[in-house]
């Protein structure tokens, strides 16, 4: 970008000038550091203090730590990075001083001992064999000095990403904005047109194709590990897509031209820019809808003139911190790295809440590998990625047997620990060092191979060959090393990142299986931060039974604002119920302090809190007043009837309620029938008033009559709708049929051998017509029940099942439909013979009946 401004006098800085570090005076006294010392001396003293506080001065290999720290400090000073390290320390120190949990590390930064000493990371790089050069390499750093001022090449600067506890992330950002006022902003990103979108839109507009037709075409565009192929690659990989493109050349040609063009701009979700200069002096700015400043330079350009920080909110840290706080533990000093933790990976079936491991691919790899220590767990995370996944079975066999395939005896000590597979980029670096290069040079090789810098590869290939000759090594080593370098570029992973994240995976495993009640409580509390909180609650609730924990119903009398422990179980929090606003909740809790003696008190409190009768009726149907042991449909009718009454009529009902055991309907009926006088000696209701009351009451009564015939389903429906899960009835129990094939759950089906006949009822999460790689059309359905999820497929096959289903009037299920499915179990799905959509309906208002 700078090259475009050479004709202008200093339009922007010639590089990144680091923001001026403002170290608070209190730090000098607190850390016993002489005020007025240089930033380098301040950083050095921070490290010396940490050597004692972290017990490094007691280690047998303490000299290794001293030498490494000395080397890293020298490199930081030489390259001009001291202030950058202190910037990171200052931000993370603010978090630590304010009891804001931070992560163990992310990316290559975990390879720096200095960052570990100043608590920016919490993974010991020497203990885990991590390389500093993977984080900072002199061979790929550049600085310019202009008029005595140092400017850094932003594209070659180190990059520290910081994980912050999710709910406290904004506090850290506010600190940065306050301390560097006028010099911070968010960062612009550009969103581009995907090939899949282009082919669909061009198909509709240029090819005049229907929506179904273009969807069918886009479905055959291949994807690998969730990433959709570019159009030119899809053309080579898919015969079906190639056939379409050959017959619709104009559509394909235009779509290829549009693919990759900027569609719109966005804001980087975690990035924040900090500059030495005021923002308006060096860059154009714009404002978000919330009034926050955003650079008008996009992400790659702004890094050439300012420092970019990633402040990421990590929900897992919220869960870990909440769990530890309740137990009185310090999560940075947990005894998680022991055989007692890794035994849970030997037969893992409940991955919810385990950091990284709960993702489907990672879970699959973990079950296959069965890691026995932190290093093997790091290998699991590294293998669960495109390319690397091909080596899963090979590595799993090595873990089980200890046998591996040697590519050359010279490298066995490096590759033997990972089953002969260069799982980590650092292993390639070790191989390069072993033939005679420095770690800096090894990082250069890794970088040019990883970035596919084709023009630089031949020179380095020759250098390696010459170095091997110079050191009188086997000439075959040259070809072996270069092949590993080229191949591993497609799958090798950063060991620093893998170890950091594996540490958090191990911590969550330790907490979940040793303190399940506290861990699940924290998971449920954090569900509010998820994009779909109720879906998250449902997923969490599916595992609770395996730990002998019940998720007790929300109760307007017993529940607290948030989820809480009750005996050996967990009580649902009122703030997680759909339709209950923060204001209503606050009012409800305030009224509840005087204790509800009966349901009429509850009806009054709900109205005073601002809860409308529709929401209250739904809450009653969901069981939030079950402590009064009433039939829910009837209790809802009581609340609705009570709501119709005038204030005078309500007073009179309260006077006689105890006589009728607080049954509102009986009290109203008796008072009206016997024309009893109220507290003012007037009749309870005039005939005219009764006619008005009766008209409204009849509407509610009709709904009651309809729903009470399916009360079990009504209870399930409202629980699922408002809470995300059903605690009184399992879906299977609601629709069980004694005389027919037994309904199974997703868990029971998962335990069956393939080819077993199955019948299941579930809620549709997704349903879509698709086309297989072989060109066969099928209906894909993803369903869920209280135990998990399962994918199902209805295909034609020899019996034309799909065709017969639609010709017989069958419809594609919609999200949240309830379906009964019949078929046979495959490895991890069901191949369907037939399906039926259940038409049971719950009525919530009179218009439902009229329609």
Report each predicted region and the residues it spans.
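Noncatalytic, beta-rich nucleic-acid-contacting surfaces in large DNA/RNA-processing enzymes
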Residues: 5-851
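Charged alpha-helix within mobile-element recombinases
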Residues: 1-2
């Amino acid at each position: 970008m700078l090259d475009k401004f050479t004709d202008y006098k200093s339009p922007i800085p010639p590089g990144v000038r680091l923001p001026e570090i403002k170290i608070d005076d209190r730090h000098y006294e607190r850390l016993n550091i002489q005020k007025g010392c240089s930033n380098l001396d301040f950083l050095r003293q921070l490290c010396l203090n940490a050597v004692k506080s972290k017990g490094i001065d007691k280690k047998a290999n303490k000299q290794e730590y001293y030498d490494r720290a000395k080397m890293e400090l020298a490199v930081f000073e030489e390259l001009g990075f001291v202030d950058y390290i202190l910037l990171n320390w200052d931000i993370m120190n603010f978090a630590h001083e304010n009891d804001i949990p931070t992560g163990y590390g992310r990316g290559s930064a975990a390879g720096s001992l200095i960052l570990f000493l100043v608590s920016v990371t919490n993974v010991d790089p020497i203990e885990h064999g991590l390389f500093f050069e993977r984080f900072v390499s002199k061979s790929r750093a550049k600085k310019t000095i202009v008029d005595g001022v140092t400017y850094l090449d932003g594209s070659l600067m180190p990059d520290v990403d910081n994980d912050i506890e999710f709910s406290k992330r904004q506090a850290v950002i506010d600190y940065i904005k306050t301390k560097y006022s006028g010099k911070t902003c968010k960062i612009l990103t550009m969103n581009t047109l995907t090939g899949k979108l282009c082919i669909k839109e061009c198909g509709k507009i240029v090819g005049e194709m229907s929506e179904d037709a273009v969807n069918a075409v886009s479905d055959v565009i291949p994807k690998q590990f969730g990433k959709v192929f570019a159009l030119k690659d899809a053309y080579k990989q898919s015969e079906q897509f190639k056939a379409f493109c050959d017959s619709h050349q104009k559509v394909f040609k235009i779509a290829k031209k549009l693919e990759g063009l900027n569609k719109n701009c966005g804001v980087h979700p975690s990035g924040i820019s900090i500059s030495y200069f005021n923002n308006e002096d060096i860059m154009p700015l714009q404002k978000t809808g919330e009034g926050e400043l955003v650079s008008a330079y996009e992400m790659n350009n702004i890094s050439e003139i300012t420092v970019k920080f990633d402040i990421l909110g990590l929900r897992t840290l919220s869960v870990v911190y909440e769990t530890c706080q309740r137990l009185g533990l310090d999560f940075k000093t947990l005894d998680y790295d022991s055989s007692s933790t890794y035994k849970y990976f030997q037969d893992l079936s409940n991955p919810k809440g385990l950091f990284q491991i709960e993702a489907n691919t990672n879970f699959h790899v973990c079950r296959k590998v069965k890691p026995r220590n932190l290093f093997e767990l790091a290998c699991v995370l590294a293998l669960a990625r495109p390319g690397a996944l091909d080596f899963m079975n090979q590595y799993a066999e090595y873990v089980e047997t200890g046998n591996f395939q040697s590519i050359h005896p010279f490298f066995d000590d490096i590759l033997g620990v990972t089953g002969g597979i260069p799982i980590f980029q650092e292993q390639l670096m070790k191989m390069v060092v072993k033939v005679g290069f420095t770690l800096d040079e090894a990082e250069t090789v890794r970088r040019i191979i990883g970035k596919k810098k084709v023009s630089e590869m031949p020179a380095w290939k020759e250098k390696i060959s010459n170095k091997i000759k110079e050191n009188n090594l086997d000439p075959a080593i040259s070809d072996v090393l270069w092949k590993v370098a080229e191949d591993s570029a497609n799958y090798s992973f950063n060991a620093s990142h893998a170890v950091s994240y594996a540490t958090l995976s191990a911590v969550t495993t330790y907490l979940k299986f040793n303190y399940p009640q506290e861990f699940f409580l924290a998971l449920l509390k954090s569900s509010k931060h998820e994009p779909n909180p109720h879906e998250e609650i449902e997923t969490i609730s599916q595992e609770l039974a395996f730990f002998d924990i019940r998720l007790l119903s929300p109760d307007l009398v017993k529940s607290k604002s948030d989820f809480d422990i009750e005996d050996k179980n967990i009580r649902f929090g009122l703030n997680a119920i759909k339709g209950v606003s923060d204001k209503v909740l606050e009012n409800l809790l305030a009224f509840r302090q005087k204790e509800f003696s009966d349901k009429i008190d509850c009806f009054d409190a709900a109205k005073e809190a601002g809860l409308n009768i529709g929401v209250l009726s739904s809450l009653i149907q969901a069981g939030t007043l079950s402590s009064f042991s009433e039939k829910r449909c009837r209790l809802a009718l009581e609340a609705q009837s009570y709501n119709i009454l005038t204030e005078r009529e309500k007073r009179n009902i309260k006077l006689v309620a105890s006589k009728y055991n607080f049954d509102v309907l009986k009290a109203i009926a008796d008072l009206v029938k016997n024309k009893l006088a109220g507290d003012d000696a007037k009749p309870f209701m005039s005939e005219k008033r009764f006619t008005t009351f009766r008209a409204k009451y009849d509407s509610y009564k009709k709904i009651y009559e309809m729903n009470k015939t399916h009360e079990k389903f009504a209870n399930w429906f409202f629980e699922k709708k408002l809470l995300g899960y059903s605690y009184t009835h399992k879906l299977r129990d609601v629709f069980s049929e004694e005389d027919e094939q037994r309904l199974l759950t997703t868990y029971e089906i998962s335990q069956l051998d393939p080819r077993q006949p199955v019948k299941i009822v579930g809620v549709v999460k997704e349903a879509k017509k698709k086309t297989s790689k072989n060109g066969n059309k099928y209906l894909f359905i993803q369903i869920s029940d209280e135990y998990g999820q399962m994918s199902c497929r209805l295909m034609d096959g020899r019996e034309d099942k799909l065709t017969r289903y639609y010709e017989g009037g069958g419809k594609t299920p919609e999200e949240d439909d309830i379906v009964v499915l019949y078929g046979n179990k495959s490895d991890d799905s069901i191949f369907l013979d037939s399906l039926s959509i259940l038409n049971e309906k719950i009525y919530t208002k009179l218009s439902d009946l009229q329609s």
